[in-house]
């Protein structure tokens, strides 16, 4: 029986994780949940999974949740302290880190320091603090399993092989909803256009990142730290069918790939049960029903966000942290109708141009740079810092 703390339980990954838990009550128990503001869904999750502890964003939400729960319920905490308490819950064997954005960094770091194994769905943890986090993982002797479908595919394709035999990692990308759109049309993209992903069902922020291809950029940076491999050995191929989730090419010319229907339950379950596997309810892949699998090189001129991620890795040190912070601000501005879709990458690049990369030695320093990046991007976009 593996005991889980799920950070971000009401988001897309959190909901899928709990679907797997519900399907295998003999294998998993939920001891802690954290959520943002979706109290109705959180209440249902509490009633179904009976966690000992839950944490929400602020005190007002905590009080409201307390009123919604009739009878004896879990301990209800709030804020960063509450998230950390959930991430370090004494009974938890594994923490599913699925909080969206840089907000997931502090509780994930706390979980590692508390000796918890991590199922990592939060890209930004490694993007903003990759070196620090991987050093912590080694120092505390914990396991970190990727939940991203692409990194899970790479992880699976590396099993039984030596890293020194790897020629390159090939991350696949669907290309998003605008893969075939001409450059001049991208400035006219609406929020509803961008939220209509052709293959995957995801949360709003990651769906916009997928449309801009910044999502793939974040994954390139994440892969660099997860697999301790230089950026020049990480390639990206556009694969519109999203059947091959990523590949590893070896020095002898062999390529290992992981295939499957696009459904996040599969990589989540693998992270929860590694090295074993469990039934997930994912639709079987019928190869005979496929009309074909196609691959293309990314067009950096139409999707400059991906190129910015490679630049951030090349600049190194604190630059990925700034890039990520600016992206979160710019995506929020687009979702709120303040800027055009094409202005997302422009805002990120301008913010990066203002930054002088420097070494980050602590999580606190990462948070300071993250704040600087957000404020600079807001300033450049003319958004009130508050």
Curated annotation (Swiss-Prot):
SUPFAM superfamilies: 1-deoxy-D-xylulose-5-phosphate reductoisomerase, C-terminal domain (SSF69055), Glyceraldehyde-3-phosphate dehydrogenase-like, C-terminal domain (SSF55347), NAD(P)-binding Rossmann-fold domains (SSF51735). One of its GO terms (biological process) is isopentenyl diphosphate biosynthetic process, methylerythritol 4-phosphate pathway involved in terpenoid biosynthetic process. Its EC number is 1.1.1.267. It catalyses: 2-C-methyl-D-erythritol 4-phosphate + NADP(+) = 1-deoxy-D-xylulose 5-phosphate + NADPH + H(+). It comes from the Bacteria. NADPH binds at residues 10-13, 36, 38, 122, 124, 203. Keywords: Isoprene biosynthesis, Manganese, Metal-binding, NADP, Oxidoreductase. One of its GO terms (molecular function) is 1-deoxy-D-xylulose-5-phosphate reductoisomerase activity. Its cofactor is Mg(2+); Mn(2+). PANTHER family: 1-DEOXY-D-XYLULOSE 5-PHOSPHATE REDUCTOISOMERASE (PTHR30525), 1-DEOXY-D-XYLULOSE 5-PHOSPHATE REDUCTOISOMERASE, CHLOROPLASTIC (PTHR30525:SF0). Belongs to the DXR family. This is 1-deoxy-D-xylulose 5-phosphate reductoisomerase.
């Amino acid at each position: 029986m593996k005991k889980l703390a799920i950070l971000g339980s009401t988001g897309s990954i959190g909901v899928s994780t709990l679907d797997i838990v519900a399907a295998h009550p003999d294998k998993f128990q939920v001891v802690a949940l954290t959520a943002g503001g979706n109290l109705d869904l959180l209440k249902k999750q509490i009633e179904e999974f009976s966690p000992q502890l839950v944490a929400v964003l602020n005190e007002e939400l905590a009080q409201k949740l307390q009123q919604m729960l009739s009878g004896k319920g879990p301990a209800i905490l709030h804020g960063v302290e509450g998230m950390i308490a959930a991430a370090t819950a004494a009974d938890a064997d594994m923490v599913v880190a699925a909080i969206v954005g840089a907000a997931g960094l502090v509780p994930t770091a706390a979980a590692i320091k508390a000796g918890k194994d991590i199922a990592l769905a939060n890209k930004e943890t490694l993007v903003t603090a990759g070196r620090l986090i991987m050093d912590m993982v080694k120092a505390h002797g914990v396991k970190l399993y990727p939940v991203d479908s692409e990194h899970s595919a790479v992880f699976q394709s590396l099993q039984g092989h030596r890293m020194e035999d790897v020629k390159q990692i090939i991350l696949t990308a669907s290309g998003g909803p605008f893969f075939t759109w001409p450059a001049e049309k991208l400035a006219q993209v609406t929020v509803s256009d961008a939220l209509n992903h052709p293959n995957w069902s995801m949360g709003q922020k990651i769906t916009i990142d997928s449309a801009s291809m910044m999502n793939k950029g974040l994954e390139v940076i994440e892969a660099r730290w997860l697999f301790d491999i230089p950026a020049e050995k990480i390639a990206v191929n556009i694969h519109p069918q999203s059947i091959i989730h990523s590949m590893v090419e070896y020095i002898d010319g062999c390529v290992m790939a992981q295939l499957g229907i696009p459904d996040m339950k599969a990589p989540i379950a693998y992270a929860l049960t590694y090295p074993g596997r469990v039934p997930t309810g994912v639709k079987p892949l019928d190869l005979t029903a496929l009309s074909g699998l196609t691959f293309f090189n990314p067009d950096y001129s139409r999707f400059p966000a991906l190129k910015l991620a490679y630049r951030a890795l090349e600049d190194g040190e604190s630059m990925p942290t700034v890039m990520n912070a600016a992206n979160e601000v710019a995506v929020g501005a687009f979702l709120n109708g303040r800027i055009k879709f094409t202005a997302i990458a422009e805002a990120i690049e301008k913010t990066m141009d203002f930054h002088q990369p420097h070494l980050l030695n602590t999580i606190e320093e990462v948070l300071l740079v993250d704040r600087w990046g957000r404020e600079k991007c807001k300033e450049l976009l003319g958004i009130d810092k508050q």
